[in-house]
Structure formats: structure tokens, C-alpha cells
Amino acid sequence: MLRLGSHVSMSGKKMLLGASEEAASYGSNTFMIYTGAPQNTRRKPIEELNIEAGLEHMKAHDMADIVVHAPYIINIGNSVKPETFELGVNFLQSEIERTRALGAKQIVLHPGAHVGEGADKGIKQIIQGLNEALIHDQDVQIALETMAGKGSECGRTFEELAQIIDGVTHNELLSVTFDTCHTHDAGYDIVNDFDGVLNQFDKIVGIDRLKVLHINDSKNERGAHKDRHANIGFGHIGFDALHYIVHHPQLADVPKILETPYVGGDKASKKAPYKWEIAMLKNGEFDPDLLNKIQNS
């Protein structure tokens, strides 16, 4: 069954219930959340996440396979500052606990940045961090994200992800998030040869590890190593390629999450595009006037 949704907000008093309500308003049947602000470690206690009411709403609206995204401040690739590494490991463990409490099975993680020490050192540090953070009997997988390769990011190739996975003791607890914008920006030709890229991924990492898809267009040409998301059909990947990926038979059971930019000039008037983009990906017809329609809605 096609599970298609977007990033939604989990905040205020409603928390998980509010996230599910927002997702339902977009015509989604899955969604992705941060457990709090992605740029800090301030988090509400689990009992204040309004989980019971949220799960009831999800059940009533056929929401399933929801995904949690770990915050950007976690960098377990940092071998220069021990305090940054330690914070990353400890906070990742507490985020795994929140993910489990929310009933999600996947927590998306940017593998980490080597901060100038080189990819090999960064990957070694990430392996150490994951070995420390993972508890062998947990039922949550860390879904390492394919990265664009901007700055000192690790995980910019399938080989780097495989290297991390191979080094982790309990690697049955690792999966992969395939981000279309990142993979395109990293240099993979998902526009003209997605099947070839998927076969390559299968040979190097294993398609059985692909548990989350981030569906984003890209503002940049292939191989730019930039990571700038564009609205569906309005970037260098294009609608046809993204529609093909969303409906790919080998990925039928993988939840697909949109992280495309809000539409509008100033912050106050920006609007979420997800209701329109989800409808477009379902019906298979690109609307070149979509951004104007969203702005004027």
C-alpha cells in the first residue's frame, strides 16, 4: 500500500495528536516528526507527548509507518570535540526512547560530519557512536540518511553507508533513508536511471535496509553537493522521475515523506505545499501552475 506523507509539526499541547491532524489535512496516510526543535536538546517528557490521543487519531485516519527525525545537533562523526560526540550519543539514546514511545520503528539520522578530519576518521567515529548508542534488544532502527556531500558530511555514497553499517556490531538495528534530493546532489543519476541506481544500492547496501524515502526535488544540478530542496516538479529532478520513484514496485511498502519548501514570499504568508504535492503524486499529473495556486489559496 502506498504510504505517502510529509514532515509535520509536533508542538503545543496537542503534540502527537496535532501532528496526526495536520497530516490528515494534507490527505496523508503517514508522516514524519521531530520530537522537539531540531536545533536544540529541549524536549518534553514522554508523558506530555499526548501519545494515546495521537495513536487513536492515527488509527481512525489510517496513519501508519510514521517516522521520527533525529535533530541536526547530533554529530557522532566529530572526533575533534569529545563533548559534541558524547552529547550526540546520549541524546540519540533518549531520542530512540521517545521514538519507541511514539510507536515509530524508524528514526532518521544524518550519519555525521568529520569536521575536517577526513571521511575515514569520521566514519570510524560514527561507528563508535552507533555502537555506544544502540541497545541490542531495542525495536527501533536508526535509518541512516543518504547525504548530498556538502561540507564534511559522511554518508555521501552508498559505499560510505555500507562501511558504517559493516562496522556496527548490532547492525540489524540499522536501516537507510534514501533522500532523492541528497542522492541526486551527491551525483547519482536518479532522473534517467533510477533502476540502475537502485540496483547499485542493492549490491552495496542491500535493498532490504531501505526503510524510509524522502521525496524532494532539487534546486541544483546533479553532483552539486549542495542539498537544497525544491518543490515537486520544480527542480532538476522533475515530476516524472519523482512520480516513478513514489510508485516503484520494489519500494511499495516504504513510507514516502515530503520535505519540500513552504511556498510564499515572506515568513507570515508561507504555506505548506503538501496537500497539493501529495494529490499530484497520487494522480500522476504535473501542474506547472501549482506554486501560484498554493500561494493564492
UniProtKB/Swiss-Prot annotation:
Catalytic reaction annotation: Endonucleolytic cleavage to 5'-phosphooligonucleotide end-products
Binding site for Zn(2+) 1: 69, 110, 145
Keywords, in A-Z order: DNA damage, DNA repair, Endonuclease, Hydrolase, Metal-binding, Nuclease, Zinc
Listed SMART domains: AP2Ec
Enzyme class: hydrolase
Alphabetical GO biological process terms: base-excision repair
Tagged with keyword Magnesium: no
Record-linked PANTHER family: APURINIC-APYRIMIDINIC ENDONUCLEASE, ENDONUCLEASE IV ENDODEOXYRIBONUCLEASE IV
Name of the featured protein: Probable endonuclease 4
Pfam families: AP_endonuc_2 (PF01261)
InterPro entries: AP_endonuc_2, AP_endonuc_F2_Zn_BS, Xyl_isomerase-like_sf, Xyl_isomerase-like_TIM-brl
Binding site for Zn(2+) 3: 182, 227, 229
Family label: Belongs to the AP endonuclease 2 family.
HAMAP family in the record: Nfo (MF_00152)
Gene: nfo
Species of origin: Listeria monocytogenes serovar 1/2a (strain ATCC BAA-679 / EGD-e)
